[in-house]
A protein has these predicted regions:
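Serine-hydrolase catalytic machinery in alpha/beta-hydrolase-like enzymes
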Residues: 1-95, 192-193
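Conserved alpha/beta-hydrolase "acid-adjacent" motif
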Residues: 164-170
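C-terminal catalytic histidine-bearing segment of alpha/beta-hydrolase fold enzymes
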Residues: 179-218
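Short beta-strand/loop motif that positions the catalytic acidic residue
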Residues: 150-151, 157-159, 163, 184
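Short beta-strand immediately N-terminal to the catalytic nucleophile in serine-hydrolase-like folds
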Residues: 100-102, 125, 158
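Gly/Ala-rich beta-loop-alpha elbow adjacent to hydrolase catalytic centers
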Residues: 102-106, 110
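Active-site nucleophile loop of the alpha/beta-hydrolase fold
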Residues: 58, 123-132
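Flexible "cap/lid" loop of the alpha/beta hydrolase fold
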Residues: 65-75, 128-152
Length: 218
């Protein structure tokens, strides 16, 4: 069901067929934001796992931006707004225990969400561990600083060993915080969530999903 967060940001929320669940999940999309791929993911997780699941748009009011424009606009995003929307989405689930996962830029914000203290578990898929130079702005903090301010042990991160957005030295830094990291040999950026992408690796994707769902369920 499409709804709006207090900020006005569009969100999708789905409860399991039995009604609202005591366990919830927030999903932060990749840089391209809300679209049928994520509507389907939210519904699938709600039905298969029995969780109340909410997702929201990263670029509210600018949904028509193409990928090049979104990449260029990364520096205009502010942590206070995005993380405020993440917390509001958690509240929208009505759940007692809430995890969070995200992809690409959304994964970066999952790491930053550690500092909010709102979420019980954090699962970034190929989220940037340091803010890319082209996205640095006055409202952007560093994910590693957020991890230092919260419970880094609540993080299970999924990364591809060939992903230029998460270079090995950054992944080492993430692991040193106490986060658990799953490194997939030969995998590039975006290898899990979108089967239409050339980078998709069905075997690795299935393994990553199994591990992430287990992490969120504990």
């Amino acid at each position: 069901m499409r709804t709006g967060l207090p900020s006005g940001t569009a969100a999708e929320v789905v409860h399991p067929p039995t009604g609202p669940s005591p366990r919830g999940l927030v999903v932060i999309p990749d840089i391209m934001g809300m679209r049928p791929l994520f509507d389907d993911l939210v519904a699938r997780l709600a039905i298969q796992q029995g969780w109340s699941v909410a997702a929201f748009e990263l670029f509210p009011g600018r949904e028509d931006l193409d990928v090049a424009d979104r990449l260029a606009a990364g520096s205009s995003l502010e942590d206070d707004r995005v993380l405020g929307d993440a917390v509001a989405a958690a509240d929208l689930t009505g759940a007692e225990t809430v995890g969070i996962l995200g992809f690409c830029m959304g994964g970066m914000y999952v790491l930053k969400a550690v500092a909010t203290g709102r979420f019980d578990s954090h699962c970034p898929f190929y989220g940037m561990i340091r803010v890319p130079d082209q996205w640095r702005g006055a409202g952007q903090g560093e994910p590693l600083d957020a991890l230092a301010a919260g419970d880094a042990a609540s993080v299970l991160a999924v990364v591809g060993a060939q992903d230029a957005w998460t270079p090995p030295d950054h992944v080492d830094e993430l692991e040193a915080t106490g986060a658990t990291v799953l490194r997939y040999a030969g995998a590039d950026h975006g290898f899990v969530h979108d089967p239409s992408r050339p980078a998709h690796r069905s075997g690795d994707a299935a393994d990553a999903w199994r591990r992430v769902v287990d992490w969120l369920a504990t």
